[in-house]
Amino acid sequence: SAAPVSAFTLWKKEKVVLTKGAEFLGRFKGGEISDRRYCTKCGGHISVDHPTLGLIDVRIGALRDFPFKPKVHLNYAETILPMRDGLPKLKDFPAAIGGSGETLPE
């Protein structure tokens, strides 16, 4: 996305099930580390599969009735829009999924 911030959730791939609209799911494989899914009707971003991490990120707008409360900022080393919200800011990803786990100051 071209937005300076995007809201997504990270899940283990086996926990994600598409319940409706599979016929409109397009795919763009950007490389070995990401496999993007989008809606072929509207172009909306649905998810990104991260095979090397064993995770899939699903955009909040693709989830219905999901009580979203942000918990962390990821890839904050690349931010162009500093956020002063009290949430932890990780340089990249948590160490548990292959990132540095390094936090950055607000």
Predicted regions, residues:
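A short Gly-Trp-Pro
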Residues: 1-106
